[in-house]
């Protein structure tokens, strides 16, 4: 291959730093490490557990020893430290904190501290790493890299591992894009989190119960490009796992209704038939009276049939408007609005079918029964529009067939009691659009 390799292809040592004190707020971490590891050399990587940095920087919070009270405070601190909750599992919260770190409990930790304390992460771990690096250079005359670590879980895999939350003096990432492997294959997306690999390796020496919060990785070819651990964080817009599964499903449910927009310009991309069929199947679960199925969707799949129907409807609409006395230019503008049904990749006509409707001897109840069935079909239409939207398909409901019911039945050879309730243009939107804003209820929600 060509280009620098992050691996050493030689022996790497991981050395414990023995004899460090129990750190307390105000302690000089660089002085303690220099005293315990005077053997540090240029090019070493000093790997430090974030907990001792937190202790030295006074990031300890007094806590009650009563387990319930301690847990209550811990949860309050998590709430304070987190900027958002990604996922919940029983009592465990996966959060993003102000640093952009995604981990359990926003880094609030009660391990390896006194029972009357809880620890928070350092305010700026990258700055802490730079300070420690400068202090070791001043005291020992060596140029080292520093990695500050914390324990994190991983998506897809059980168990935790240490990762870098602060870094100074090394390239935290190695991007292999464009580099060729020994077989001549170009690497496309490979980017190695070098600082995280160092953090995980050092944890094999530091452990969790060894009272060894600092280790030194020796023999690794360090290159300093000025990057810090912040470069390891993937911003939310680029994160494929921005939410936990349950939370993503919940957000999807909340946004489903707002995805529906009236789309009037479609791309030429074909619409997969199975998506339309699946959306119709969901739409038919809409509420209906008397356990009936009053909705039918007529899918105009044959281009000639669609064109013939729309041409006849256009002629009728133009004739009606002429009878109304509208000027020719106004008529053509009104008629042109129906062009969407010609242009849309797919068109579906919702129908009211009175199967199962109750018969009454009086007009009032007969009209009410018809209204009830009309509402049911309207619910199915809205359900279809939403079902299409959640599948990435745009749609627009057009009322035109209501004004030409006899014509529609005749052209499509449908029973005389089937009532067209508009037409639905379907396709992929020509331009993407975001969620609709909810309409303020205000005067539209009447309270009695």
UniProtKB/Swiss-Prot annotation:
Q: In the record's cofactor note, how is the cofactor described as bound?
A: Binds 2 divalent metal cations per subunit. The ions could be magnesium and/or manganese. Monovalent cation. The ion could be potassium.
Name the positions where a divalent metal cation 1 binds.
109, 150
Query: Can you provide one Gene Ontology molecular function annotated for this UniProt record?
Result: coenzyme F420-0:L-glutamate ligase activity
The ranges of region (Dehydro-coenzyme F420-0 reductase) come to 245-448
Question: Part of which pathway?
Answer: Cofactor biosynthesis; coenzyme F420 biosynthesis
Span list, region Coenzyme F420:L-glutamate ligase: 1-244
Ligand binding (coenzyme F420-(gamma-Glu)n):
320
Give one GO biological process term: F420-0 metabolic process
Q: Which residues bind FMN?
A: 260-264, 288, 399, 436
Instruction: Give me the residues that bind GTP, please.
Output: 20-23, 50, 55, 112
Q: Which CDD domains match?
A: FbiB_C-like
What EC number(s) is this enzyme filed under?
6.3.2.31, 6.3.2.34, 1.3.8.17
> Do the record's keywords include Acyltransferase?
no
How does this protein's activity depend on the pH of its environment?
Answer: Optimum pH is 8.5.
Q: Which reaction does it catalyse?
A: oxidized coenzyme F420-0 + GTP + L-glutamate = oxidized coenzyme F420-1 + GDP + phosphate + H(+); oxidized coenzyme F420-1 + GTP + L-glutamate = oxidized coenzyme F420-2 + GDP + phosphate + H(+); oxidized coenzyme F420-(gamma-L-Glu)(n) + GTP + L-glutamate = oxidized coenzyme F420-(gamma-L-Glu)(n+1) + GDP + phosphate + H(+); oxidized coenzyme F420-0 + FMN + H(+) = dehydro coenzyme F420-0 + FMNH2
Instruction: Note whether Manganese occurs among the keywords.
Output: yes
A Pfam entry, by short name:
Nitroreductase
Q: Name the UniProt key words of this record, in alphabetical order.
A: GTP-binding, Ligase, Magnesium, Manganese, Metal-binding, Multifunctional enzyme, Nucleotide-binding, Oxidoreductase, Potassium
Where is it found, in Gene Ontology cellular component terms? Answer: plasma membrane
- The residues the record assigns to binding a divalent metal cation 2 are 151
Q: Which cofactor does it need?
A: Mg(2+); Mn(2+); K(+)
Tell me the HAMAP family matching this sequence.
F420_ligase_FbiB
Recorded family membership: In the N-terminal section; belongs to the CofE family.
Q: What does this protein do?
A: Bifunctional enzyme that catalyzes the GTP-dependent successive addition of multiple gamma-linked L-glutamates to the L-lactyl phosphodiester of 7,8-didemethyl-8-hydroxy-5-deazariboflavin (F420-0) to form polyglutamated F420 derivatives, and the FMNH2-dependent reduction of dehydro-F420-0 to form F420-0.
**Entry protein name:** Bifunctional F420 biosynthesis protein FbiB
Q: What is the lineage of its organism?
A: Bacteria, Bacillati, Actinomycetota, Actinomycetes, Mycobacteriales
